[in-house]
Amino acid sequence: PELSAEPSSGSRQMMNHFGSRFLNEDGSWRNLMEQKNSTSDMACLASQFPRLVGLAQASKVYRENEALAKNKSKFTSGGDEVAYATIGNSSCAEGHFFEAVNAIGVLQVPVVISVWDDDYGISVANDLQMTKSDVSEVLKGFQRDEKGEGFEIMKVKGWNYPALIDTYEKAEKLAREEHIPCIIHVVEMTQPTGHSTSGSHERYKSKKRLQWEEDFDCIKKFREWIVESKIATKEELDTILSEVKEFVKAEKKEAWKVYQAPLKAEWNEVLEILTSLKEKLNIPELDGWITDLKQTAMFGIFRRDYLSVARKVMAKITKEEMAEKSKLSQFITKINTENKQRYNSKLYN
């Protein structure tokens, strides 16, 4: 976990829960007007929505307070900011979502909420978790009236790229210029894979549904639109796809190599100590532990594996007085100290 390699969170969060860094190394604020800003996702997803209320309200305060609006700021351009939020259809059933939507409607702050709706919440169909199986139907009471109070609620198909462009352009304009909050219900979304690497949506979807998802896959339809619009030919897209796949494979391989290098050095250090101990002491379990370390390393070296073995060995040699014991103790202390910085620092920022 290095900020230089993963500046979002130093690898403390899931890979898609990324966020911008708002502070410099000395703790001072960066100029947020000179960068794109994103706050990290949370799980369960609706729990990130109360934060959305505050982010959007900040823009309203900046716009309505003349002193703040006139001054050049690191945080606002006269209150013209829009807070974008994304959530899946099933997470809309969580309480924080409705509380936040109500607060946003009351405050009339610049928000664009995207609800990605693929008719499922992992394996649970919409009709089992959302009234009327349709979140925008449920939210109709929030639709703005002739007084202009409330939300502008729009519905658009996820595979229709031109319609998406038109919808988001309209929503962004309303939110930015008039501080009218918008909800975009993006329907007919598809699920390319299972919810996790161990999941498989083939287990709970009909063959008909799976065929529809293949035919209306958003990336496939986007590709068709590019060709139909004569932006690029099928052959050009095939070439780009092939080049991108090779690029990603190479980058993945290099990233893994860089990630494994310091772990390999620590792994070797532990193995050297254990091998030396094996020659001097009769510890029945030691052969098995060394073998396990070597076998697991074939698939990837992880700090928890060799640190766990180091602790087990340390418990076996507590009464011994030897250089290996001192080295192992120092190694464990060093890793534990470094781990406090890696994983425990700044937890309450």
Annotate each PLM feature.
Residues 92-94, 119-123, 161-164, 190-195, ...:
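Flexible loop/turn segments at secondary-structure boundaries
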Residues 176-177:
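Long, amphipathic alpha-helical stalk/connector segments used for oligomerization, subunit docking
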Residues 116-117, 158, 187:
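Active-site-proximal beta-strand/loop segments in catalytic clefts of secreted hydrolases
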Residues 63, 75-81, 131-170, 214-243:
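Conserved thiamine diphosphate
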Residues 189-349:
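Conserved acidic/glycine
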Residues 1-114, 121, 125-143:
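Cofactor-binding active-site loop characterized by glycine-rich and histidine/acidic residues
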Residues 97-100, 166-173:
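Glycine-rich, charged/polar anion/phosphate-binding loops
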